[in-house]
Regions:
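Non-heme Fe(II) oxygenase metal-center motifs and adjacent flexible, charged/small-residue loops
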Residues: 3, 58-384
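Serine residues within intrinsically disordered or low-complexity segments
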Residues: 2, 16, 43, 54-57, ...
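Low-complexity, intrinsically disordered segments with a bias for serine/threonine
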Residues: 6-9, 20, 37, 47, ...
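Compositionally biased, intrinsically disordered low-complexity segments enriched in Pro/Arg/Gln/His
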Residues: 13, 17-26, 49, 64-65
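Generic low-complexity, intrinsically disordered segments
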Residues: 26-47, 51
Length: 384
């Protein structure tokens, strides 16, 4: 898995590669920071889009670190006209709630009164920031582990994967179909088979494939080595908005049906993916030396401190229009979540999932897997 941030077709050239240093800790500095450019395997045939103007950025563009080890917050920013037009939610979606069990949103919390359940759940005490260029998670500024780091493999980020125009068109097409109320203030659209994960059964009767507007997205994924053989059989669109208090709890995606790679396209606004692990044991840390981050990439510093896994949360900044790929430990061992505090404007995500080995060639369910792929890649789907 590459530790570098890959660049989408519309990427511009950037400035200095690394964040500024302050007392041994990387400080997010959008004006001087860049990510290493990794070109796709081949150019996009027939692509006549204009290249974006050069701009300075960093792996956590649009974010600021608090002085204390508190959660990352997003900077508010004005939205362009196209996005604003696409982002206006229908008024009626703010009057209903789809929460069940212990999960809540702002709508049902106001109706029920009292503190929301999540306020009483254990909070992670040590926060680290993931740096895409190194593949390491670094202790947040002025935290107990400021300047300490550990390797965090299995995350690939492709920035500017779609253009602003493509983003606006995709969201407009999504909004033409109905959104279903979901848990924790989200709305959703599913393109995939009906699945009972508990009984490990699925039905294909209502599945007509991925939506037509995803055909180009899936084709473009194949231009990158990490996704060159990626063939999704399911797409889940999720709609988040601050007015509903939208969020998603820490979770691991199923591994019976879904395969090695989870791929998610982040639209309309930046956010933060928060990753945590409940496993016992400790993480070994390295003290970032004066040569950070190159020394970390080379593995030149021996571990000299540890922290309990259960107390760690890793923040992975997701820029607007970026594509995230999770594999390996990041896919199977670290739970991922989107906290309510990291939704400051409407956000739409499109998550694509591939089949597990059981449904691939030589697997026990290879015939069913072949049928699912044929349906999926017809791109004639409507939300199920």
């Amino acid at each position: 898995m590459s530790r570098r941030t890959e660049r989408g077709p519309m990427a511009g050239r950037r400035g200095s590669r690394w964040p500024e240093r302050r007392h041994g800790t990387p400080v997010l500095a959008p004006a001087v920071c860049r990510v290493q450019e990794v070109a796709p395997r081949e150019s996009v045939a027939g692509d006549d889009r204009k290249e974006a103007a050069p701009r300075a950025s960093c792996p956590a563009r649009g974010l600021q670190l608090p002085a204390a080890p508190a959660a990352l917050r997003l900077r508010s920013g004005c939205q362009d006209a196209a996005m604003a037009a696409a982002a206006v939610a229908a008024p009626e979606v703010l009057r209903e709630c789809g929460c069940k069990g212990i999960r809540t949103c702002l709508i049902c919390e106001r109706q029920r009164g009292g503190d929301p359940p999540w306020q009483h759940s254990p909070q992670k005490t040590h926060r680290f920031i993931y740096y895409t260029d190194t593949g390491w998670a670094v202790g947040a500024e002025e935290s107990d582990f400021e300047g300490w780091a550990f390797p965090f493999p299995g995350v690939t980020l492709i920035e500017d994967f779609v253009t602003r125009e493509e983003e606006a068109e995709m969201v407009q097409l999504m909004d033409r179909d109905p959104w279903k109320l979901s848990q924790s203030g989200r709305r959703k659209q599913d393109y995939g088979p009906k699945v009972n994960f508990r009984k490990q059964k699925l039905k294909t009767a209502s599945f007509r494939g991925l939506p037509s507007f995803s055909r180009e997205v899936v084709r473009r994924m194949g231009l990158y080595p990490v996704l060159e053989d990626f063939r999704p059989v399911e797409q889940c669109n999720l709609d988040y908005c601050p007015e509903r208090g939208s969020a998603i709890d820490p979770h691991l995606d199923d591994a019976w049906l879904w395969g090695e790679r989870l791929v998610s396209l982040n639209l309309l606004s930046p956010t933060v993916l928060s990753m945590s692990r409940e496993a016992p044991g400790s993480l070994l840390l390295c003290l970032a030396p004066s040569g950070f981050p190159e020394a970390l990439v080379e593995g030149a510093v021996a571990p000299s401190r540890s922290v309990l896994c259960q107390e760690v949360e890793v923040a992975v900044p997701l820029p607007r229009r970026s594509l995230l790929v999770l594999t390996g430990a990041a896919r199977h061992q670290w739970k991922h979540a989107i906290h309510r505090r990291h939704i400051e404007a409407r956000r739409v995500s499109a998550t694509f999932r591939e089949l597990s080995a059981d449904f691939g060639p030589g697997g026990r369910q290879q015939d069913l897997g072949r049928e699912l792929l044929q349906i999926s890649l017809s791109f004639q789907g409507r939300p199920t």
